[in-house]
C-alpha cells in the first residue's frame, strides 16, 4: 500500500450509506470546520497584532516600502493595512474593516482592528470549550446592543458653537500622529476649515471635498495655512502679470493654438507667398480667439490641461500678455469641479460660448513666492457663495507632507463626526473599561451559555487600555486593575493619562473623542467578528 493513502478504519462505504443518519458516519470530517475557523481567526489576529504597537500617543510608527521602492512613514491604521500585502481572505476582512471605519468615522482605524483581534481571541477560547459558533455570534450581537447603550449613557451632548471642545477633539486625534507637536497649529486650522464650509445650525454632515488639501514641498509644518479661496500649484504662464485685482476669471477647456485637421492630411507649401499666407491665417485665427476672450472682460484665464496637443501656443501667450490677461495653464481635470464651486466660474468647451456670465470673480489673484521653495497662485475674496476652503500643507520632505495630510484628514473627520452626532465621550481607554465593567454586570443577569459569551466579550474590551498602557511603557496588568477598581467606585471618566504616565480623570485632561468614533468601531468590529465566526469552509475557485 502506498504511504500517502491512509488505511480506512471506519465501516465500508455501503455500511455508512445504510446507516443513514445514525452515528457519526453520515458526516465523516467533523474536524474540518473547526480547523478552518481557527485558521481564519489566527490569520485575522496576526493582522491585529501587527498594528497593535501603533495605538495611542506613545504608539510607534511603521515604515512601509512598496515594490517600487517608495517609502511611507505612518501610524495611521488604515494606511498601514492598505499598504500591507495581505493574502489570507480572513485577514483581508480586517483590512476592509479598517477601511470601513476610515470612511464612516475617519478616526479609530487602529482601535477597530485591535478590538476585532481581541474579540477573535475570546472566540477561540469559547470555541475550545465546545460552545457553538451561532450561540457566540448571537450573544456578541446582544452584547453590542447593550454596549452601544452604555456608550451613549457615558457621552455628553455638545454644541458646534463650543469651539474649545472641537479643538480638544481635533487635538486628541492629532496627538497620536507623527505631527503631534504641531497639534496647536493644525487643530484650529481643521476646526476653522470645517466651520467655514457648513452652516453650524442646520448641518448634519460635512462634504470633505469642499476642503482641498494642497501639498507644497519646502518650509516646515509651521508654514501650513488655511486659505479662504483657491490655491493653485501651477505657475503663471506669462511671467509679466503676476497680480490682478478685481479679477474676472474664465476657465476654458479648448486650446488656444492653431487648429488641427481631423484627418491626417499633409499640405505641401511650394513658395514663400503660400508660407506667408499660412502663418498670417494662423495669426489671425489665434488673435480672433484672444479678442473674443478679452471682449468678455476676462483678465485671468485658467486653461485645462490637454493631452492631445499644446493647449496654449507661444503666439497666443504673446497676445494674451499684450492684453494684460494673466494665464494659468495645465489645470487638472479633477480640480475643475472644485475651482468652479470656489470662484463661481463655469467651464467653457468652445470659444463661441465664452461670455461674460461664464466668468467668476474675485478680489485678488496673485502669484506668491514661498521663500525660495517655489510659487503658488492664490485667488482670494471670491464673490461666489460656494463654501470651500483650501489648506496648504508644507513640509521639508515628501514623507512629512504626506503624513501631515493624513493627520489633517483624520482631524477633519473627527470634526465631521461631531457634526453628524453631536456627542462626546472620554478617551484614554475609559469607555472600554466602563464597557467591560457594565457588560460583566449585565452578564450576571443572564443564564447559560449566553452569560458566558457576554462575559468573554466584556473581557475582550480591556485590550484597548491594556495596549495604551503597554505602548506608554506602563505595566499593563497593574494599570488595568487600578482602572477597573476606580470605575467600580463610580469614576466613569477615569482613563490612562499617557502624557503623565498614570491614571487620572481624562475629561479634565481634555482627552475627548466623538461618540460616533467609539460606536462605529464597536459595531464594525463586532460585525466582522461575527462574519468570520460563521465561516466554516474556504473554497477556492478558478
From Swiss-Prot:
InterPro entries: Chap_CCT_delta, Chaperone_TCP-1, Chaperonin_TCP-1_CS, Cpn60/GroEL/TCP-1, GroEL-like_apical_dom_sf, GROEL-like_equatorial_sf, TCP-1-like_intermed_sf, TCP-1_chaperonin. It comes from Bos taurus. CDD domains: TCP1_delta. The modification Phosphoserine is found at residues 39, 187, 205, 447. This is T-complex protein 1 subunit delta. One of its GO terms (molecular function) is ATP binding. Its EC number is 3.6.1.-. Pfam families: Cpn60_TCP1. Mg(2+) binds at residue 107. GO terms for biological process: protein folding. It is found in: Cytoplasm; Melanosome; Cytoplasm, Cytoskeleton, Microtubule organizing center, Centrosome; Cytoplasm, Cytoskeleton, Cilium basal body. Transmembrane segments: none annotated. Component of the chaperonin-containing T-complex (TRiC), a hexadecamer composed of two identical back-to-back stacked rings enclosing a protein folding chamber. Each ring is made up of eight different subunits: TCP1/CCT1, CCT2, CCT3, CCT4, CCT5, CCT6A/CCT6, CCT7, CCT8. Interacts with PACRG. Interacts with DNAAF4. Interacts with DLEC1.
Amino acid at each position: 500500500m502506498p504511504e500517502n493513502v491512509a488505511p480506512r478504519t471506519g465501516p465500508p462505504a455501503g455500511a455508512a450509506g445504510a446507516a443513514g443518519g445514525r452515528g457519526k458516519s453520515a458526516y465523516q470530517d467533523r474536524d474540518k470546520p473547526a480547523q478552518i475557523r481557527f485558521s481564519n481567526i489566527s490569520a485575522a489576529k496576526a493582522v491585529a497584532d501587527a498594528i497593535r504597537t501603533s495605538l495611542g500617543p506613545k504608539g510607534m510608527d511603521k515604515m512601509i516600502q512598496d515594490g517600487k521602492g517608495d517609502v511611507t512613514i505612518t501610524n495611521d491604521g488604515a494606511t498601514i493595512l492598505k499598504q500591507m500585502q495581505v493574502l489570507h481572505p480572513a485577514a483581508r476582512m480586517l483590512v476592509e474593516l479598517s477601511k470601513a471605519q476610515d470612511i464612516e468615522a475617519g478616526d479609530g482605524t487602529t482601535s477597530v482592528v485591535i478590538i476585532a483581534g481581541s474579540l477573535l481571541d475570546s472566540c477561540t477560547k469559547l470555541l475550545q470549550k465546545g460552545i457553538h459558533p451561532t450561540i457566540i455570534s448571537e450573544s456578541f450581537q446582544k452584547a453590542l446592543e447593550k454596549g452601544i447603550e452604555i456608550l451613549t449613557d457615558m457621552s455628553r451632548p455638545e454644541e458646534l458653537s463650543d469651539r474649545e471642545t472641537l479643538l480638544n477633539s481635533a487635538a486628541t486625534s492629532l496627538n497620536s500622529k507623527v505631527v503631534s507637536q504641531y497639534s496647536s497649529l493644525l487643530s484650529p486650522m481643521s476646526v476653522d476649515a470645517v466651520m467655514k464650509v457648513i452652516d453650524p445650525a442646520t448641518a448634519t454632515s460635512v462634504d470633505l471635498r469642499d476642503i482641498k488639501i494642497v501639498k507644497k514641498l519646502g518650509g516646515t509644518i509651521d508654514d501650513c495655512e488655511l486659505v479662504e479661496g483657491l490655491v493653485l500649484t501651477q505657475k503663471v504662464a506669462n511671467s509679466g502679470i503676476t497680480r490682478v485685482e478685481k479679477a474676472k476669471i474664465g476657465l476654458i477647456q479648448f486650446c488656444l493654438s492653431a487648429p488641427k485637421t481631423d484627418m491626417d492630411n499633409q499640405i505641401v507649401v511650394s513658395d514663400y507667398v503660400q508660407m506667408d499666407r499660412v502663418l498670417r491665417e494662423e495669426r489671425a485665427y489665434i488673435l480672433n480667439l484672444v479678442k473674443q476672450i478679452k471682449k468678455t472682460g476676462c483678465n485671468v484665464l485658467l486653461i485645462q490641461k490637454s493631452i492631445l496637443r499644446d493647449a496654449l501656443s507661444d503666439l497666443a501667450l504673446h497676445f494674451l500678455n499684450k492684453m494684460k490677461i494673466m494665464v494659468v495653464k495645465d489645470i487638472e481635470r479633477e480640480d475643475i469641479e472644485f475651482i468652479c464651486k470656489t470662484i463661481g466660474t463655469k467651464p467653457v468647451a468652445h470659444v463661441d460660448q465664452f461670455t461674460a456670465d461664464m466668468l467668476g470673480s474675485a478680489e485678488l489673484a496673485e502669484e506668491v513666492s514661498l521663500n525660495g521653495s517655489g510659487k503658488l497662485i492664490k485667488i482670494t475674496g471670491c464673490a461666489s457663495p460656494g463654501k470651500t476652503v483650501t489648506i496648504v500643507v508644507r513640509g521639508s520632505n515628501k514623507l512629512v507632507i504626506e503624513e501631515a495630510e493624513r493627520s489633517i484628514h483624520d482631524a477633519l473627520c473627527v470634526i465631521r463626526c461631531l457634526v453628524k452626532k453631536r456627542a462626546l465621550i472620554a478617551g484614554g481607554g475609559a469607555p472600554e473599561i466602563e464597557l467591560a465593567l457594565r457588560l460583566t454586570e449585565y452578564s450576571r443577569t443572564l443564564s447559560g451559555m449566553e452569560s458566558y459569551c457576554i462575559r468573554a466579550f466584556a473581557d475582550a474590551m480591556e485590550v484597548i487600555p491594556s495596549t495604551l498602557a503597554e505602548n506608554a511603557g506602563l505595566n499593563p496588568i497593574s494599570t488595568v486593575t487600578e482602572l477597573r477598581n476606580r470605575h467600580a467606585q463610580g469614576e466613569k471618566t477615569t482613563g490612562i493619562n499617557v502624557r503623565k504616565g498614570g491614571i487620572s480623570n481624562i475629561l479634565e485632561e481634555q482627552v475627548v473623542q466623538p461618540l460616533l468614533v467609539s460606536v462605529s468601531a464597536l459595531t464594525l468590529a463586532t460585525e466582522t467578528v461575527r462574519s468570520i465566526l460563521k465561516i466554516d469552509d474556504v473554497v477556492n475557485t478558478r
